[in-house]
């Protein structure tokens, strides 16, 4: 048995099939990404389109996302350069494109991402949803207090009405 965080690619499946091995995929769980920013950052909405543009380096400054922003360059931080979070961002959000060098980097752990974002107003962190929970909230309806969780929209322009934060209920429905 093997466990993967994604579906196997055609090339991977062909490799298995050429060796007379026919893997079956079974979905065990659904996870989600969370985009976090510093508490001082007033930007709390982002479209997937703008996130893609940030990750590929097309957008590098907060003013390009929000003309009223007083922040400067966007510094995106991931948990680890080899993590499934980075892989998902490259494959599913950026359509196979490489992540931009310069304003996108990786630390070593999710906790380091949270700490970095909490200390740097220009930072945006990308972490797994399971790292967001407020430990003092037994209902699991609030997020960690040291950071702000962004709401994300599939529409080109993010608004409060079309954007969603990564609450557990949304993960349940995939």
Residue ranges and their predicted role:
Residues 1-31, 36-174:
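Exported/periplasmic ABC-transporter solute-binding proteins
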């Amino acid at each position: 048995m093997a466990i993967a965080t994604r579906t196997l690619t055609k090339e991977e499946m062909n490799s298995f099939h050429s060796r007379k091995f026919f893997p079956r995929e079974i979905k065990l769980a659904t996870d989600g990404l969370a985009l976090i920013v510093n508490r001082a950052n007033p930007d709390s909405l982002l479209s997937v389109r703008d996130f893609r543009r940030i990750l590929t380096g097309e957008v590098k400054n907060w003013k390009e996302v929000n003309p009223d922003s007083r922040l400067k360059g966007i510094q995106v931080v991931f948990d680890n350069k080899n993590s499934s979070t980075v892989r998902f961002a490259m494959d599913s959000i950026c359509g196979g494109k490489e992540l931009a060098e310069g304003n996108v980097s990786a630390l070593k752990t999710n906790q380091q991402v949270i700490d970095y974002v909490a200390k740097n107003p220009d930072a945006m962190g990308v972490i797994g949803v399971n790292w967001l929970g407020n430990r003092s909230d037994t209902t699991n309806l609030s997020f960690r207090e040291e950071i702000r969780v962004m709401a994300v929209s599939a529409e080109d322009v993010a608004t409060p009405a079309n954007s969603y934060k990564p609450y557990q209920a949304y993960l349940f429905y995939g």
